[in-house]
Amino acid sequence: MKNKEKYLTNFSEAKRKEATQKYNIIKPFILGKQSLSSISKSKGIALSTLYRWNKLYKEQGLTGLIHNTRVDKGEHKLKQNIIDEIKRLALKNKRNSIATIHRKIANYCIENNFYKPSYKQVYSIIKAMPKSVIDFSHQGEKYYQNKYDLIQIRESSRPNEIWQADHTLLDIYILDQKGNINRPWLTIIMDDYSRAIAGYFISFDAPNAQNTALTLHQAIWNKNNTNWPVCGIPEKFYTDHGSDFTSHHMEQVAIDLKINLMFSKVGVPRGRGKIERFFQTVNQTFLEQLPGYINNNDTSSDLIDFQNFEEKLRYFLIEDYNQKEHSAIQSTPINRWNSNHFFPNMPSSLEQLDLLLLEIPKSRKIHSDGIHFQGFRYSNTNLTAYVGEYVLIRYNPNDMAEIRVFYRDEFLCTAISPDLADYSIDIKEIQHARSQRRKHLKQNIASPSTTDLIKEEKSYGYSPQETTKNVKKLKRYRND
């Protein structure tokens, strides 16, 4: 039987976290900051093991470190509260030697009737702690900032060398899917070299890890619009607000694709002038022309709804901003990104990005007619053999025509909704159609189904993109 290629989604969260820990150990060597021999001495890990980890990571990405998970035999596994106590003692006082900590933890275990760890176990736990964390605890925040904080982002010299993500609360009031007046958030990923927009996400929710991950998924993969060629794997990816706004899944995908994931601290500028100027451009050349713009005195105009606003924003980003000459680079962002016939580094397959998609926490049952999700039916011939089984679903809220189906951590198939297969439908349009249907029912008017309402709007609804060359969406095939 042919071996299936393994992706991050094939492994449990625990396995991926363990592999991430291995990567973080060899990361200073990969970035050219520390030799493997010095890492071996500081971490107490055999040099041959570090060489093997580095080789596996270079060849296979993060999955290589998962494949070669080693299990230590003959050692007692320490309880988490013992490990936490060891770390607490290590951070509490910089004068505490490892021998002192070992004696204190032995007394702690005797008092609580726990198994006492060996000196070697205590040593390994302390040496595995990030030096930056220890320095922050022992030396203070100012010392930490001077030593570890990034001062500025250097100027990039080629496309996809540096991507930046940032978020802003737009200065406009629009109608959300429920008809309420609201202000939307915009998440942007910009290529630093060309100023081209690689991905975007608009939502009424405040910035979060989920939205950043979905934007990165869109930015990396090929777009259906030929006027928007920006794609590929960036060498460095700066995301705002720190690790609280970056999911473990996004970190794992970044490691697997060899993206150097870096964070900007809240309230501390880190070379973010380009993307901040872009947000000013959005305000001055796009938003101020629309009803509901905060700085306009006229508040009597009818507000536009979310769907209409999103279509206008998409047109502005792709057909206007990306295609207009930028004064700082003396070129359009798209031409600059495409200069010298640039060929982006792409994932080997879409499966490598699956962890960036939304995950349904509750498993779904496969029925004889497929999988039922969000009021639609999704089918694929591969599901026939799994009727009655429960599967995990991942999906992109910007394209609800298909879902990714996983069975026991293995990718099973892409299931297609026959009702939506010929359209590019996002979850906001589904919510809008449901809202319209509820209004019809409240008025005792015979209402078409949600599906029919979506199709009607897609067939006859105005879209700003109609004024440009239409690009046909890739045909979806129901049989994988």
UniProtKB/Swiss-Prot annotation:
GO terms under biological process: DNA integration; DNA recombination; transposition
DNA-binding region: 36-55
Residue ranges occupied by any Integrase catalytic domain in the UniProt entry: 155-341
Gene Ontology molecular function: any one: DNA binding
Record key words, sorted: DNA recombination, DNA-binding, Transposable element, Transposition
Classification via Pfam families: Mu-transpos_C (PF09299), rve (PF00665)
Protein's UniProt name: Transposase for transposon Tn552
Species annotation: Staphylococcus aureus
Taxonomic path: Bacteria, Bacillati, Bacillota, Bacilli, Bacillales
